[in-house]
């Protein structure tokens, strides 16, 4: 049996060699004509239209022309003899076709693609068989058809440090079935009601502290799957819990008035309440997973980066000497550390090999959020005036600083086929360091795409890189299939997921288990890429979030306090992420 093939296609030439050959078969009715002489020929008009979007069809007129006075019927059949799976299907309006003396007969060939037909070159054999099982006398005909993808652009927006319980206390989502809790249990087995807090650092109830989201904080909160240790998570060392911190600082939810743009997106499109970060800790490994499906130092290592940097504030291959990152085994033991410069295949390599354009938008180089700077063959670091600097061609051409350039590129019709968009600290939603503009930032990107021609063929994936130390009630699942990456390893905690597209399911709650590997697998299937062989192997491909055959959703602007012009014109210095 052929292996399953992608659910989406990229623009590709679908060659349909309609080989009008004779195959054994039968026809009905009587026939007349000279014995031993050719009885008919076949012709095929060019497929019309010559280009279709996957899920549509094209037609050709097949003409059966009698020869040597033949009168009788000719049966037509077609079969796909090469190409991808599922292949296009074909059918005839009339078969058998009757021909009489000098009068030809016709039939319409319809070649139908489905939304899941992969790009590739296909050969269709169209066979004719008369009453004596004779083939047409003139041999093969060749037709060609160009297909365009349903999804041609994917934008991954990667925000910071939230859980569904913390960020999405939305009555509409809850009414629609989203699994959101209003209370939780602490290590003393007490029920703690979640309390409101502002998203940013300004306002009447500011979020002026951060919580640890190190691997040790994960272990405390997870508590072997009981999810009752959130109260044991300390405030981040960078903040040290100010005196006015709440009695239960981990058991908080963001004021709904601060995140209405997020609610609007989640209510209109698809919201995932079983999206988990792949790693059990903070941002540096999370950003490696969203780029590569792994945070391992090498392709053969069974250890994975588990923490942010120690010994220096600059990350990746341009980190200062003495900077290290902790490594963890699949069993959850942090036992060693190394310099944070890695070498293995990333999704960008698969995109480059297939000729699929990509860009990674980030606020700065050397950040724990700028994943490509930790991949040696992308960074290709050199020393300039005593400072390490990334200098590789992929870095120079595809890593774009600052992150607001994505808004300019959309407006100028220069959006790559795959984009990662990383926020500045101010717009990141990260506790203590954000100014509350994250919902406007995300909405600005969505609105720019929604009001452009890109809307018709774009999928926007919005998620958050880790849980940030906030309480969430859903325990992560164990990756335990025994064969793929991470077998026996537990996912990190839930993070929100919003899928925005004209082909996203409307007002849909996805209860399917997703993780960062799902985003990679979605990109792989969309562009017919091979598997990275890491977290993508065990992941789903987000297919339950889409309906590629429904009427595309008409975009409606997402109301927000700030628009694209604000972020394009904002020249404030970048706010660095936390380093805990």
Language model regions located:
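N-terminal pro-sequences and low-complexity stem/linker regions of secreted or lumenal proteins
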Residues: 148-580
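Bacterial N-terminal signal peptides that target proteins for export
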Residues: 1-13
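Core hydrophobic alpha-helical transmembrane segments of single-pass membrane proteins
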Residues: 14-18
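Long beta-sheet-rich domains in secretory-pathway and surface-associated proteins
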Residues: 26-148
């Amino acid at each position: 049996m052929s292996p399953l093939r992608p659910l989406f296609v990229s623009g590709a030439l679908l060659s349909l060699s309609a080989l009008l050959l004779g195959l054994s078969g039968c026809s009905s009715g009587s026939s007349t004509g000279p014995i031993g002489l050719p009885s008919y020929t076949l012709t095929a008009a060019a497929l019309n239209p010559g280009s279709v979007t996957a899920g549509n069809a094209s037609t050709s007129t097949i003409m059966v022309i009698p020869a040597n006075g033949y009168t009788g019927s000719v049966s037509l059949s077609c079969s796909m003899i090469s190409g991808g799976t599922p292949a296009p299907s074909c059918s005839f309006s009339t078969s058998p076709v009757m021909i009489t003396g000098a009068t030809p007969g016709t039939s319409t060939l319809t070649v139908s693609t489905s939304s899941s037909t992969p790009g590739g070159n296909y050969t269709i054999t169209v066979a004719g068989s008369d009453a004596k099982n004779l083939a047409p006398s003139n041999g093969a005909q060749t037709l060609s058809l160009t297909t365009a993808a349903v999804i041609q652009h994917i934008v991954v927006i990667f925000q910071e440090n939230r859980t569904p319980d913390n960020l999405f206390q939305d009555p509409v989502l809850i009414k629609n079935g989203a699994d959101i809790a209003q209370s939780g249990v602490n290590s003393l087995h007490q029920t703690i009601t979640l309390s409101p807090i502002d998203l940013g650092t300004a306002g009447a109830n500011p979020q002026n502290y951060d919580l640890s989201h190190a691997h040790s904080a994960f272990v405390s909160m997870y508590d072997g799957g009981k999810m009752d240790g959130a109260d044991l998570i300390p405030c981040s060392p960078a903040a040290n819990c100010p005196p006015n911190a709440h009695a239960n600082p981990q058991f908080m939810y963001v004021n709904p008035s601060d995140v209405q743009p997020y609610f609007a997106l989640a209510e209109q499109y698809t919201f995932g309440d079983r999206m988990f970060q792949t790693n059990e800790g903070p941002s540096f490994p999370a950003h490696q997973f969203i780029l590569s499906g792994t945070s391992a130092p090498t392709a053969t290592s069974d250890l994975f980066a588990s923490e942010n940097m120690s010994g220096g504030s600059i990350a990746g291959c341009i980190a200062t000497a003495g900077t290290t990152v902790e490594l963890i085994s699949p069993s959850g033991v942090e036992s060693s550390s190394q310099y944070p410069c890695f070498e293995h295949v990333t999704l960008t390599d698969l995109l480059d090999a297939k000729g699929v354009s990509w860009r990674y938008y980030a606020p700065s180089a050397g950040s724990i959020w700028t994943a490509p700077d930790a991949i040696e063959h992308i960074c290709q670091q050199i020393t300039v005036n005593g400072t390490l600097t990334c200098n590789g061609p992929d870095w120079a051409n595809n890593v774009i600083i600052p992150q607001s350039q994505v808004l300019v590129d959309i407006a100028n019709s220069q959006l790559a086929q795959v984009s990662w968009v990383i926020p500045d600290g101010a717009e990141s939603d990260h506790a203590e360091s954000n100014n509350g503009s994250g919902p406007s930032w995300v909405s600005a990107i969505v609105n720019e795409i929604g009001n452009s021609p890109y809307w018709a063929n774009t999928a926007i994936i919005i998620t958050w890189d880790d849980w940030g130390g906030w309480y969430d009630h859903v325990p992560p699942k164990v990756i335990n299939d025994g064969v793929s990456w991470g077998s026996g390893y537990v996912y990190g905690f839930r993070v929100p997921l919003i899928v925005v597209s004209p082909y996203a399911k409307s007002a849909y709650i996805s209860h399917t288990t997703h993780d960062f590997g799902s985003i990679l697998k979605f990109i792989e299937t969309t562009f017919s890429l091979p598997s990275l062989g890491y977290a993508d192997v065990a992941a789903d491909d987000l297919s339950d979030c889409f309906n590629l055959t429904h009427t595309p959703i008409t975009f409606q602007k997402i109301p927000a306090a700030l628009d694209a012009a604000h972020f394009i014109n904002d020249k404030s210095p970048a706010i660095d992420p936390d380093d805990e």
